Amino acid sequence: MAAIPSRKGVVVHINVFTVAPEKQQLLVDSLIETVNEARKVPGWLSARVHRSYDGTRVVNYVQYESQEAAQAVLRHLAAGGYLKRNTELGTVAPGQYEVVYTLDSVAGLQT
């Protein structure tokens, strides 16, 4: 399991998508493609894609080194049509956050 650092300056975007169950996997695949493109931009740190068991939600969790890096990634993805495609597959409720605390199981961090 990847650690989520709580260091100063790291910007976190958590996007919660509501999606029709028949489109959930399409959105998951699209978000995976999107984060693989995003990782090419300096300042991008990490991403996670989660799907709900009931098929109606997908959550995308992304970390950036700074606000500037987050904006650069979003501009890059918008120019490539990634953001438009994702929002055509589901309705997104975006949010920007700062990590203030993390706690991990020692066993969960072993590889």
What are the roles of these predicted feature ranges?
Residues 6, 37-45, 63-98:
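An amphipathic, aromatic/His-enriched active-site/gating alpha helix that lines ligand/cofactor pockets
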Residues 9-13, 21, 100:
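Short acidic/polar alpha-helix capping motifs at helix-coil junctions
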Residues 11-18, 48-77:
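Short, well-ordered beta-strand segments in beta-rich or mixed alpha/beta enzyme
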Residues 18-30:
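Short, surface-exposed ligand-recognition loops at beta-strand->loop->(often short) alpha-helix junctions
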Residues 31, 35:
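Short amphipathic alpha-helical/adjacent loop interface patches that line ligand
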